[in-house]
Each structure stands twice: as C-alpha cells, then as structure tokens.
Amino acid sequence: MALSFSIYTIFSLVLSVIAWKIFYNRHLHPLSCYPGPFIWTVSRVPYAAYYAQGKLHRRVQLLHDQYGDVVRVAPDELSYRNQQAWKDIHGHSRNFPKDMRFYHISKNKAPSVLVAPDGVHRRQKRAILRAFSEPAQKSHECLLHPFVDTLIHKLQQKVEDNNSVVDITEWYNYVMFDFMALELFGESLGCLEDGVYHPWVDMLFGSIKAWAFLSQSKYFPTISWMIKIAGLLFYSDLLQHRTTKFDSIAARVPGDVESDLDQPTFTTYIKARNDPQSILSREEILSNHSFMMMAGSETTATLLSGCTFYILKHPEVHKELSCLIRNRFSSPLEITFSSLADISYLRAVLQEALRMYPPLPLGMPRVVPSGGAIVSGQFVPEKTSVAIASWATYQSSSNFKDPQSFLPERWLDMGPGDNDIKDAMQPFSVGPRACPGKMLAFAEASLILARLIWAFDLELSPQCSNWADQRAYIIWDKGPLLIKLKAPS
C-alpha cells in the first residue's frame, strides 16, 4: 500500500510539474504575447520532430502563412520572414551570438569562423578574407578551369557511348569537392576522374540525418543522454567513420605555406603571415578547412543543381540562356569569370535559383543578448533564440510577387520584380558574419553552368519533374537529378 501510494504521489508530482510548465510557457512566459500554435509554444518536441524528419522548412512556411511574419516556433524561439529581421539580428550594429545548441564545434575543439566568438572571429576572418581578394579570385579561376574541362570531357564521353542520361547533381558535387580539396589540402579527391564519390564525401552526405537527429539532444538536456545513446545505436558505424575521416583530414593539412602548385591556393592565402593580427593556429586552420570543405563545395553544387532543374523546367529560360551564351562565345576558352560577369540574365537566373532553392533552407539561429532587443519592431527578451526562416521568407507573397513562380526577370531592371522586397533574400547572410565567398560562388556557378550549356543541349528526365520537393536537414537531402545530354543543335 505504501509503495503504491509513493508511486502515485511521484506520478502526480510529475504531472503537476508538466501541467505547470505548459501553463507557464503558454500564458506567463516572456514570449507568450507572440503568436504560434499551442503545442509549439509549450514544447520543443514538434520543432525537433519536424527537424529530424527533414520537414521543418515546409512546416515553418505554413506557420508563417497562418500567423504572419513572426511565429513562436518553440517555447524560447521566434522565427521571422521579413527584411527588417535581417538587419536587426545580423546587422553590423548588432551583437546577437550564435545559438550554440544548433551548431557544432569541431572535433579538435578549435572553433571555426562559423562559430568563433567575436574577437576570435574577427582575427580568423581577416585571414580568410585574403583568400577572396581580386588576385586570389584569379588564382581560384586558374585552378578551377581544369576541373571544368574534365567535367565537360567526361560528359562528352557519356554522349559518345550512348550513355547520355546522367545524374548531374553527382557531377556538380564531383567538380566542387575536387576543386575545394585542391584549394584546401593541395590535392584533388579524384571524384571526377573516378566518376564516384570519395569515401570522405560519401560520409558527409551519409551523415546528414545523423547530425539532424543528434543535434536535438542539446535542446533536451534532461534526456540528452537518451538521445545520444539512441544516436550511437543507430549511427555508430557512421560516427566512427566520421572520426576516422577527420583524423585523415588533419594529416592532409599542409604544414607550410609553400605549394607544388603553380597557383596559390586558399591555404596559401590563409596561412600568409603578412598580418600578425590574423595568424591562425594549426588547429584553427584544420577546423576552418573542415568547415570550408563543405561550405565551399556543397552549397555551390546545390545552387547549380537547383538552377539546372528550374532552367529545364522552364524551356523559355533555357532557350534564352542558351542563345545568349552560344551567340556570345565562339569557343569555350572565351568563357571566363570576367567574360561572364556582365551577362545580367545569367546572374538573374542564378539569383532566382537561390530564391527557389536556397542551399540553406532553414534559419540559422542567434540569441538575443542581455537586456533584450527590438526585432522587426517588437521587443524580444534576452536569451530568446531568433532565426530568419530562409525558405519561408523567399516563398512569401509579402516579399515576392508570384513567389512560387521561377521568374529570373524579377532581378532585372524594369522587370516584374520591381515591387519585390529583394533585401528579404540574403542567402549569404548580412553583417560582420556574412559569407565572404559570395562573389566567388557566383563566378564558379556561372562558369560551370555556362560551359555546360555551351557544350550540350539539356533535357530533364520526366521522372525528375518534382525533383525540388525534398527534405532538408540543414542542407537539402537531394535525390538524383537525371538529365539527358545531346550535342548542341
């Protein structure tokens, strides 16, 4: 009798605590004045569940359509989808630190430029910015051209062998991962030559879902051990493989500035010691190389994949772009960063592809600093997690006319997007932590896309007509994008 009474008492206390927590979160919490569905405002479980399933970006879009430009998506988190939020959260005059529950620290515990504290970030970014100077841009182009030549040659062989249907997503990844490996580690991964992913790249894509699952443990500290154990049970082989690959990367980071290559690389510029205020330790270089290997390759390959899909879904865009490129260039040797820079329609196509298929469709959360802050015209208390939902923002009719339509012309002067709020789209972020690789990413994507369109007529496989309807785990979980290649007509 005493035992059953004790169990009943404990059970009642637990229920009382849960009931009080629900009541507090809904009615007394500092964010209780912000709109959101009941279950999301009292518990983080719905957010975590949709995130782990890869469906968060679409669910948050629907919540914004229902509740407006700001939605409470968890007891302590707000989601935004307007232009002002970019300035208020990420602007130069702001000091909203990263929400470290969302991010990961490198295995060697040295923070990369993505997550480093402000002082460390400034020092690291000074070093990294050297790799994006105008002279550096020319070096990067010289290193990229041979990979693009190999890509075109390999695809031409496919056409000659009557094997003209290819998964272009894979080939874009081959190019970009090989290129970034050369830039960062001094040697290619050999993906293009072998026509298969290097084991390290395979591991990266295979671990997307594991990261999504395990990252949620930080949001549930009382049961984080259970989540981690479950993750180890389901993903133990993958996590061990990841550790092995990180160690192999560490062994490949060059120890000296000198390189056997004719052109300076990212590593050359980053390790140059002409500024004593921007010297990186070997551990910091390793962390940043690991980060940039993904950030500098997967995102550009994703942009190219999304752009190719939407071009081929819209024959009028494909025709216009093909005519522009083939009429302008009589030889592929003429297609360079500089010769493509003033083709405004090509830039507009890439911009619209970024809007329709942003490489990072989810928000990257920050934390409101001590004392609170005004975000999008409303006071937000300190310690609140805030993020701009990229997918929801770019697909909102309050920011873009006909947001579900692929309209490159909206980015041209006097086009149908004159009344669009274009500053609501910031795929490279804004402020002191904005991605410094914006111009290089556009140049790389322009070059690869232009060379492909110059060399081939392209046709989308019917089975890929809904290719962009994908799940997202920080990045997209892309399926095969099958296209048919033909010699240009």
What are the language-model segments listed below?
Residues 2-123, 145-154, 175, 210, ...:
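N-terminal membrane-proximal hinge/A-helix region immediately C-terminal to the signal-anchor transmembrane segment
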Residues 39, 141, 145, 196-206, ...:
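Cytochrome P450 I-helix active-site segment
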Residues 130, 290, 295, 337-338, ...:
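Cytochrome P450 heme-thiolate "Cys pocket" and heme-binding signature region
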Residues 1-5, 474-489:
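C-terminal helix/juxtamembrane-tail motif
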Residues 299-312, 448:
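Short, small-residue alpha-helix embedded
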Residues 97-107, 139-302, 320:
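Cytochrome P450 heme-thiolate monooxygenase catalytic core
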Residues 388-416:
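Conserved cytochrome P450 K-helix/beta-meander segment immediately N-terminal to the heme-binding cysteine loop
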Residues 315-318, 438-475:
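Cytochrome P450 heme-binding "Cys pocket" and the immediately downstream C-terminal segment
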